[in-house]
Amino acid sequence: MIDRTEDVPGAYELLTKGRELLRNGHPHQAALVLGKAKLLEPEKASIREALGRALYLSGWTLRARREFAKAVQIDPVNDYAHFALGLSCSKTGQRTRAIAHLKLAVAMRPSAEAYRRALAGVSG
């Protein structure tokens, strides 16, 4: 009998692979890998955030917004998740919600120029 459990990657390995795919410009493939990681560890904010990034970069903004919202729910002090949720909300017509999350991101990390630019862009 062959034991194949050693061949099955765990959530951490899948997260690492997904992040690598994102860094190398392959968001679609990253979304597939990170989706598998989410099935293994659905309450890990880091997986939800990375999956949200992959989905956002793949053009699946509504799905990305859901992942970022879950990441924020799991880890409310995750400034990047608030930032990304704000961007996703802005792209899906939820301006008020976008501003709220972008303000939180800026408050959590005032030195992040990208956060401030995004807030200014949405606020008008």
Regions from the PLM with identified roles:
Residues V8-L40:
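Alpha-helical segment of the N-proximal tetratricopeptide repeat
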Residues M1-D3, I99-G124:
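Terminal, low-structured helical/coil segments at or just beyond the last alpha-helical repeat
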Residues N24-K36, S58-K70, T92-L104:
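Structural signature of tandem alpha-helical TPR/SEL1-like repeats
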